[in-house]
């Protein structure tokens, strides 16, 4: 069986994530530049089995022109059009992230629901019952089946009413940094497995909770100096400078949040010890 080649149009910040996972799987991947003309995308796609696109970066009319040339596109244009018809609501101070991947043979995987606040993400979202979590995830699975999704997406919904959709992210979920450090299988690997129609991986947490927080650089310092104190204080902290995140896995959520908040405050210069 020939090794497949995939074309990808996505945000710059996630291209390297997809490339790393493709390399691990031994899959060829061509990173197509954002803003390319329809003609150039068609030309670059000639040696690809299919292309994966972020629908937020290229118009549906352009995608249809590309598809008419014989290029296979994931997610399917029909799925993109179905999602585009959904009503969006204003963002809120607390939101839920529900992430799903689906293969052409309808195998589906979801991660635990993530709580999104202004500065911290928690997976799984605390203070929601198992019954509510199941209801939310089932509604997402049903939507993925209804639109015949191939690939993956993130639904960001109001934490007070999950029926209020706030945003849809295709290749760059808000919660993907959490899954990268704390899930058996991260989003980018799972997305590739989905579009390749490979069996999907385990999406469970490695620990009871994953907590990640946003980092802000101290205007009087740099992004390197804080490592000396923070890594010595807690060697379990994970840093991601590409996304400006700090993360932690564990079973004691209260202690984890204390550590994340301390890291945020020290990193930005709010505290000095």
Task: Mark where each language-model region is.
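Short beta->alpha transition motifs characteristic of CBS
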Residues: 112-117, 167-174
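A short beta-strand motif that forms the metal-chelation/ATP-contact edge
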Residues: 98, 161-172
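Active-site "cap" helix and flanking loop/linker of ATP-utilizing ligase/carboxylase catalytic domains
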Residues: 51, 135-154, 169-217
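ATP-binding N-terminal substructure of ATP-dependent carboxylate-amine bond-forming enzymes
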Residues: 1-77
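Solvent-exposed alpha-helices and their adjacent loops that cap or buttress functional pockets
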Residues: 1, 43-44, 89-93, 102-106, ...
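Glycine/small-residue-rich loop that forms an oxyanion/phosphate-binding "nest" at active or ligand-binding sites
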Residues: 62-83, 89, 122, 130
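Internal nucleotide-binding/catalytic subdomain
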Residues: 86-152, 159-161
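Peripheral (often C-terminal) accessory segments that flank ATP-dependent C-N-forming ligase machineries
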Residues: 193-273
């Amino acid at each position: 069986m020939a090794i497949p080649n995939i074309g990808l149009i996505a945000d710059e910040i996630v291209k390297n994530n997809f490339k790393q996972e493709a390399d691990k799987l031994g899959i060829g991947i061509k990173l197509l530049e954002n803003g390319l003309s329809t003609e150039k995308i068609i030309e670059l796609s000639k040696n690809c089995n299919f292309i994966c696109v972020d629908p937020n970066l290229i118009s549906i009319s352009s995608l249809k022109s590309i598809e008419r040339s014989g290029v296979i596109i994931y997610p399917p244009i029909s799925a993109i059009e179905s999602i585009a018809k959904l009503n969006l609501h204003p963002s809120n101070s607390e939101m839920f992230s529900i992430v799903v991947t689906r293969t052409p043979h309808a195998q589906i995987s979801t991660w635990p629901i993530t709580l999104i606040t202004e500065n911290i993400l928690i997976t799984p979202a605390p203070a929601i019952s198992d019954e509510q979590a199941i209801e939310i995830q089932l509604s997402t699975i049903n939507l993925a089946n209804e639109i015949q999704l191939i690939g993956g997406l993130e639904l960001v919904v109001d934490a007070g009413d999950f029926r209020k959709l706030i945003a849809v992210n295709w290749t760059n979920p808000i919660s993907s940094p959490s899954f990268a450090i704390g899930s058996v299988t991260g989003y980018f690997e799972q997305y590739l497995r989905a579009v390749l129609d490979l069996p999907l991986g385990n999406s469970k947490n490695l620990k009871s909770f994953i907590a990640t927080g946003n980092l802000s650089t101290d205007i009087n310092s740099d992004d390197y100096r804080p490592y000396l104190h923070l890594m010595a204080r807690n060697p379990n902290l994970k840093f991601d400078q590409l996304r400006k995140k700090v993360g932690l896995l564990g079973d004691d959520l209260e202690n984890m949040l204390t550590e994340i908040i301390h890291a945020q405050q020290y990193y930005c210069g709010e505290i000095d010890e």
